[in-house]
C-alpha cells in the first residue's frame, strides 16, 4: 500500500518504434510511389511539357527536375536503409555507415525562383510532394539520432503521497 504514490520509469524510443511499424511501411510505399510517379512524368509527359516552355522556363525546368530527382534519390536511399534494418538485411552499424553518406539537410524551397510558377503544374505538384516527404523523413531521422526519451509508465497520482502517508501512519499505529 505504501507504493501508491511511486512511479516507474521506462525508456521508450518513439522513433525506433515508428521506424519498425506499419506507419513506416506506409511512408516507404508513399516514397517509392513518388519516385515511380516522378520517373514516369519526367520520362513521358514531362518531356513534352518542357519542350513547350520558353528557354528561360526550360532552364528552370531542367534545374528543378534535377533537384527533384536528387532529393528523391536521397529519400529513397534513406527509406531502403531503414527497411533493410527493419527486415534484418543489414546491421545497425551498417545502417549508420550508409546513413552518414546521405545528405538529408534542410533545403530551400524553389517557390522564390523567378518563373517557378510557370513550370508545368504536375512538376510543381511532384516537387511539393517531395518536400513534404523530405520534411517527414528529416524529422524522423533527427528523432532516431536523439537519445531515447524516458517516460513515466505510471503517472504520479497527486494524492498518492498523502494516501501513502496516511496508510503508513495507520499501519504504524496498530
Segments from the language model and where they lie:
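Surface-exposed peri-terminal alpha-helical interaction modules
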Residues: 2-174
Amino acid at each position: 500500500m505504501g507504493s501508491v504514490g511511486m512511479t516507474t520509469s521506462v525508456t521508450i524510443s518513439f522513433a525506433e518504434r515508428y521506424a519498425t511499424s506499419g506507419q513506416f511501411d506506409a511512408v516507404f510505399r508513399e516514397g517509392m510511389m513518388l519516385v515511380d510517379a516522378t520517373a514516369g512524368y519526367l520520362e513521358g509527359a514531362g518531356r513534352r511539357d518542357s519542350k513547350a516552355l520558353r528557354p528561360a522556363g526550360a532552364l528552370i525546368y531542367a534545374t528543378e527536375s534535377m533537384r527533384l530527382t536528387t532529393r528523391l534519390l536521397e529519400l529513397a536511399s534513406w527509406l531502403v536503409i531503414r527497411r533493410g534494418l527493419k527486415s534484418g538485411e543489414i546491421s545497425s552499424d551498417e545502417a549508420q555507415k550508409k546513413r552518414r553518406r546521405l545528405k538529408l539537410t534542410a533545403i530551400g524551397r524553389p517557390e522564390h525562383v523567378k518563373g517557378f510558377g510557370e513550370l508545368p503544374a504536375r512538376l510543381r505538384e511532384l516537387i511539393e510532394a517531395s518536400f513534404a516527404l523530405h520534411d517527414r523523413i528529416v524529422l524522423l531521422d533527427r528523432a532516431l539520432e536523439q537519445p531515447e526519451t524516458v517516460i513515466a509508465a505510471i503517472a504520479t497520482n497527486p494524492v498518492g503521497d498523502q494516501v501513502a502517508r496516511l496508510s503508513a501512519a495507520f499501519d504504524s499505529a496498530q
